[in-house]
Amino acid sequence: MKQRLDGLAVFRELLKDGAVAAFRELLQDCCRNDADNFVSHCGEFESLLFQQSDCWTAYLRRAVMESENVCIRNWASGAVTAVQEECLNRELAFLNRLSQVTLDDLTAGLDHAPDFLVGWRTEGGSIAQDYRRRMQEVGEKGYGIFARYHMFTVENGQLVPVKHPDPQQLEQLPGYEQERQKVIANTQALLDGKPANNVLLYGDAGTGKSSAIKAIANNFAAQGLRLVEVKKNQLYQIPDLMDALAANPLKFILFIDDLSFTSNDDNFAALKAILEGSVGGRSARVAKQFIELCKSGVQV
């Protein structure tokens, strides 16, 4: 079983998961009949497992469902090869078996098995079937960090998930119903694959512009909408972000808050170039929504 785990190709990134890596060490200890190291690695494995669940099956299922791998990326574009498909099937069958392994299964292979360890739970179900359903729903559920989170910021050119996003809901927003409905309709068009516009929201501070965008992101997250907040001094990074998101099956709002310029602001030229387009073309998966607080004398 350890050799099969070491030989993962499609789900190779699972080996970087802390609990999976610790479980691999348990398998290694069983191969070596090493009870002393088995005890230590069991404590490490359960410490990592218990941070999320006491069920190994559920933990591994979640790791598989959220995996970003070549097959899920190629599936989104309809380009999974026969070889990749075969590898995927074999690995899913193995991971399903792995998710059912208990402490008793492992200690049965030790000559001097410790009797003081407390095991973990397993449960029924098929990881392979669950993953096939996830592939069919990739346009709504996503993969990798996009499967777990729906709001992101940009740091050093990389997307960073917002682990505790603003829980703002549309029904909590007062006033401006007509204006808000236009933004909602535009967002729905984006999700439906129809032409969608870039949007500029302007008005006095405290009128709910930012809250409306965050509430829309929350409302449509289950339909495959993700929000990326970009600061004004990060405008030059938008073309790279667009390239990175172009093949992603989800839909994205690039959200730029507090968009005000001085007369000699280089960011204005960057924004103008972005809106006018580039050789890369305009993505049908990304809409840009801007917030202008109308506190600058410069008109956009």
Predicted segments, located by residue:
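AAA+ P-loop ATPase mechanoenzymes
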Residues: 1-174, 178
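A short mid-domain helix/strand-loop element embedded in enzyme catalytic domains
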Residues: 151-167, 189, 193, 208-214, ...
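Pre-Walker A (pre-P-loop) alpha-helix and adjacent loop at the N terminus of AAA/AAA+ ATPase modules
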Residues: 165-199
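Short glycine-rich substrate-engagement loop in P-loop NTPases that contacts/grips substrate
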Residues: 180-184, 221-252, 265-269
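Short loop/turn elements that form and flank the Walker-type P-loop nucleotide-binding site
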Residues: 194-196, 223-224, 248-250, 281-285
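Walker A/P-loop
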Residues: 198-230, 243-246
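Conserved catalytic/switch belt of AAA+ P-loop NTPases
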Residues: 243-247, 262-300
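Walker B catalytic acidic pair
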Residues: 257-259
